[in-house]
Amino acid sequence: MNIIYEDNHILAVSKTCHEIVQADKTGDEPLSETLKRLIKERDQKPGNVFLGVTHRLDRPTTGVVLFAKTSKALERLNRMFATGEVHKTYWCIVPNVWGEFESLKVREFESTPQTPQTLQTSALRNQTPPQEADLTHWLVRNEKQNRSYAYDERPLDRQGNPLKDAKEARLHYEVIATTERYALLEVKLYTGRHHQIRCQLSYIGLTIKGDLKYGAPRSNPDGGISLHSRRAEFIHPVSKEPVTIVAPVPDDTLWQAIAPV
């Protein structure tokens, strides 16, 4: 258990790919219950421990997970997540389809910032995606398969009407580092949809390493996928001070080699 931030109202952990945030059909103990027991023993609390779940992170995904230690913080954080006031940044490892990568140090000092392309990905079929872009798709979730499907345009139902279950999904990605075989992307979400990063990136040919569900050729040794919730930034719901929480990357050879120091 790696607690990376804690105060009187908020607790954040760096989740591993083996941990679940909330109870599911597996029957495995969720992080919320593990943390309650830890706090009760550590702080010698006589009664029940309050710990509210503010958001979820897929089981095979690693990184920052926020919990609320008070009902006031839970109510406010839930509202902040709903209104997009909690800004989360993800890192993920995908195949390096670009070859030699332009130096980040050179790009930092360009006098004119480059505006990322906004892509409707029908234009990307059989082409190499740009190193930085905004993606927009329509996602449809299949509950039985527990996966989502991406479409360039909003799909229609059998009557020819826009499919009600289709949700617009938007994100920004940028290549920030490479090795010979892999690239590290930084991803920021404009919307929060089911498996959004996994689905949208795989749709343009950038399947996350180890993500068999979305087309990766093989699993990772630890059973997880190379998608990491790197950073959460928000205004503290009680103190109103800015908070930035950063989760260290997983302790494996590839992450340690590719992630910027």
PLM regions with names:
Residues 1-261:
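RNA pseudouridine synthases
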